[in-house]
Amino acid sequence: MLNRKGSAVLLSMLMASSVLAACSKSNDTSEPSPSSSGSGAPTSEPSASASASASPSESAQALKGTINISLPNASSSVWNAVAQGYMAKNPGVKVTVDNKPLEGYKEWLTAQFAAGTPDVDMVVNNEVAGLMNDRKFMDYYPYFDKQNPYTNKPWKDSFDLSAMGINLDGVGPEDYLYNLNFESVQIVWVYNKEIFQKVGIAQTPKTFDEMMNDFKKIKEAGYTPLALAGNSNSMWSGQAGWLVRIYADQYLRDYINIARSQEQDYTYLPEVDGTWKYDLNDPFNDANSKVTKNELRQLKAIKDKAGPYKIEGNPKWAAYADNLKRLFQYVPSGFFGVKDDQAYNLFLTGKAATMMSTPASYWQLPKDFADESKTGAKGGVKPFEYGFYNMPSMEGPEVMAPARTIQIPIGFYGFVNKNAEQNALNADFMMYLTSPEGYAVYVKAIQASSDASLSGAPALKDITLPPEMTKAFADFSPIGNTEGYQSPGNSLARGLMDYQPSVQDWVGSVQRFFDGKLTTEQYLKELQANVDKYFVPMLKQGKKELSDLDTPERRPPERK
């Protein structure tokens, strides 16, 4: 579910590509040790015989405690509705909702751990890799085999695990699931049909060159072609960052031949990797469910500047950077100071022709046309007809495959790791939310809200969506996913693997490049130097050493 400060705000959820995978590998085969300071907890785990009826069951009455929810930019009305639904079934539990602004959420969440175990329980945790590495969040895997009292089936049977990118056959004792992604998102282009018609564009672009020609016409007609934020947050973790990573993928798809697990590797799974074959015609060829990756092989390739992991002097990187610069000439005036809500306002008010978004805009735009706070106009603005199109493909001799997009399960709902009783209570809340009964409350609240929309079909079984939602989601064709992979686009195109000093340096470099102060050659030289400079500190932050890369087939030792 997305709260629209814009869909422009959306991927706070896709903030850090290296953190997107919910699984965190470790050598420790023990479960995360519970905190001794968890908040009020139930006296026992929910019974498998709990009733799914509207009235509280005996086991539900045994549940006692508090669940504190603080999500970024989330609809309070929606989550309060879910909380009320859960408390009606579990009268001994109090659920509080105190959602936070997107801006500063990562810092707020990190600060909660400064004095020990936080009061907050349910959070969005995809930005805080360090806290994940320190196992500050509850592991979901131990609860998958437990009975969901709201369905009377094992909880794992509630999920479409393939759609969630989870292969339980490949989960070992060193794997942890720190966040749950049971919704979906596909990044698409949204366009103002009226502007397209006014400037003589008869059909949506299929290629990048077609889109650049269309943007030229739009700009000459006095409109902003692309409503895009350009501040540092957007360049790293928001819509600008999406485009930087998505289009790099077209040129660097052969990364998988380096990053994939080899037969001798500790990450190798015969039942998965033994049948895999490289196939550029398959846009899902490198999906995590089809082939495993060895992070050490990726890191070694970055250090050795091997294949597509070499930036400077690589003609593929040069061709990609040249096209990227073309695209970023059509952004709003004062681009590097533009924030998400400002960019979204340009589209809402008919001043910009396109924006990046998700299927959630299908329902959210009509709400936002009438929203004075988002349009800046009394009574809102006159609605216009809008449509969607998929990512147009860059073309040229260096391109390896058609464009893909970010098309992944989302949510990133995690719980602070507390004592066993509190963890069990938190898991019970999620069992309710992901059940047909709980999810129906959630969807009904979204439909009734003014500030939330469903971004895609849920990866949940036995769920029935309203007919209009089912029809709308069927209109978005899958073209493949780039997100959550150990690819050069994700690990190098915005600086080194979301290591913040590197990201900050890259933002300065790319600003100079887009402003014409750096040539393509100079920009790529700076980016390569950036990666080299921060490589060892980045390794150490992830509790790895250069010596680990000498034997990528071996599991690295655990370090405190």
Where are these regions (language model features)?
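Glycine-centered hinge/linker elements that transmit conformational signals in sensory
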Residues: 255-337
